[in-house]
From Swiss-Prot:
It comes from the Bacteria. It comes from Methylorubrum extorquens (strain CM4 / NCIMB 13688). It is an enzyme of class 2 (transferase). This is Ribosomal RNA small subunit methyltransferase H. The keyword Transferase applies. The lineage of its organism: Bacteria, Pseudomonadati, Pseudomonadota, Alphaproteobacteria, Hyphomicrobiales. GO terms for molecular function: rRNA (cytosine-N4-)-methyltransferase activity.
């Protein structure tokens, strides 16, 4: 299916003078896909700086929003937005993979719209102390919610083969084995505890592509970040949770920035709309027709306009897919996308340098 690039005029919807880091990607296209044309409840599963949430609230005076974020800093930062919209916004700290449970805790059984913006936020990247950036020195952390093992724990504690798999499958780093080997050799001398240490180490192994603006450490940092936060597993859980809470006619819009994220979303919508067979984890190996729980809103990925990528280069890899919930019951979770979100078994490793 051909990809659809948003028209150049879409950027006219952005607030005048807005900073790129505060403007959600594909905002006009997300709002069009959701079609907020009636009173109802919207769930923003990835609140961040509140860009999508504000737009949802401004779409209509009878739209209510529950906004979720696992990052307590983001939740604290949304207090002014809560006050500005007079009781129409509720902020909830938690993981969007549990959004059905989280909105039930808010005495809401179903939602009319769900939007998910997958991956790290610009705010997190820009704050050196969060440990996401290879361009600024800071502690090697990368935890979105502050809980669980940090990137430093993985880098200094995991076996070389596991590190290589993380870098290759989650970061798509072709020189994953060489990078993993260099990490293990370096940590024998001293622990790797800062982003600058790791970025310099990777840059010594991965040569920059001629003429490319991409830093040599980009893919390695991405792979570690995805592993630290279980981002792909969270995406799978979030898709299934959204499927459970959406009313018939409700819409789900998902923005991704990584090819594996997009593949998971594509397979989910393809299976749930009847375009592909569905395999359930409850009946492994059996593919059979299942109720069509979604119909496609976007026939292929919607890409940002050239104007948007000019203003916000971080948007260049973004893709939007959306679907509308049918009245069919939610089928069991899809085993195929759960597999995509996991590291392969050791014997599944392909040849890498």
């Amino acid at each position: 299916m051909p990809m659809s690039r948003a028209p150049r005029t879409a950027r006219a919807e952005l607030p005048k003078g807005a900073q790129a880091r505060h403007v959600p990607v594909l905002l006009a296209e997300v709002l069009a896909a959701l079609s907020l044309d009636r009173p109802g409840l919207a769930v923003d599963g990835t609140f961040g700086a509140g860009g999508y949430t504000r737009a949802l609230l401004e779409a209509g005076p009878e739209v209510r929003v529950i906004a979720i974020d696992r990052d307590p800093t983001a939740i604290r930062g949304g207090a002014d937005l809560v006050n500005a919209f007079g009781g129409r916004l509720r902020l909830v700290q938690g993981r969007f993979g549990e959004l059905d449970t989280l909105i039930a805790d808010q005495n809401e059984a179903q939602a009319d719209w769900v939007v998910l913006d997958i991956g790290v936020s610009s705010m997190q990247i820009d704050e050196a102390q969060r440990g996401f950036s290879f361009r600024q020195d800071g502690p090697l952390d990368m935890r979105m919610g502050g809980e669980g093992p940090s990137a430093a724990d993985l880098v200094n504690g995991e076996e070389e083969t596991t590190l290589a798999d993380i870098l290759y499958h989650f970061g798509e780093e072709r020189r994953s084995r060489a990078v993993a080997r260099a990490i293990v050799e370096a940590r024998r001398r001293a622990p790797i505890v800062t982003t600058a240490q790791l970025a310099d180490l990777v840059a010594g192994v991965v040569r920059p592509e001629p003429g490319s603006p991409i830093h040599p450490a980009t893919r390695s940092f991405q792979g570690l970040r995805i592993a630290v936060n279980d981002e792909l597993g969270e995406l799978v859980r979030g898709l299934h949770a959204a499927e459970r809470v959406l009313k018939p006619g409700g819409r789900l819009a998902v923005v991704t920035f990584h090819s594996l994220e997009d593949r998971i979303v594509k397979q989910f919508f393809s299976a749930r709309s009847g375009r592909a067979a569905q395999a359930s984890r409850h009946v492994p190996g059996v593919e059979r027709p299942a109720p069509k729980s979604f119909k496609l809103v976007t026939k292929g990925p919607v890409l940002p306009s050239e104007a948007e990528t000019d203003v916000n280069p971080r948007s260049r890899s973004a893709k939007l897919r959306a679907g509308e919930r049918t009245d069919a019951p939610a089928p069991p979770p899809l085993s195929a996308i759960e597999t995509l979100a996991s590291l392969p078994a050791p014997q599944g490793r392909g040849p890498r340098r």
